[in-house]
Amino acid sequence: MGKSLSQWDDSIFSNFVVRYGFDLSEKVESYSIGMKTLFLLGLCICSQADLLILDEPTQHLDPTVRLEVMSLLKEYVDGERSAIVSSHEIFELEEYATHLAIIKEGRIIYTDSIDEAKEKHRIIEKGESLQEGEVVGLVVQNVLVKTNSDVGRYPKLNEIVVAYLTGKSERRLALK
């Protein structure tokens, strides 16, 4: 299989197989769900493609392997390559991603670099007055606002995502 891909890297594949103990005499379908995920991710990395599109790439992996995989992906994209990762693991993405797009009902509702997103938003207490800016949505008992004012505190990535996803239906409740 690897021979048909022009940028395939046999040495990376061999190291991956040894590192994670894959038995290549077994059919992939006999692997556990986590091992299948890991194997498929290994194939993607070994392809040396300029762009990887990954859906939940760390799903079903134990925490230590998950950390290693995210480190591998970060190393992979440090050069000229890119990865688009769809994930519900927001805490994980905050450590490795540079940009985000929040998708709700099939539509992108917010996109930015992660650093800019954090810079442009603040978390304030519910009921706190807002002189300038826009209420985005509720985050538990707090409110995410998009503002240039030095109010509240900077948000975590998961707070930005939650506020945009709960968004419009919750805005009217946010400042009550």
Q: Where do the protein language model's features map onto the residues?
A:
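Catalytic Walker B motif of ABC-type/P-loop ATPase nucleotide-binding domains
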Residues: L52-E56
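C-terminal coupling/interaction segments
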Residues: V135-K176
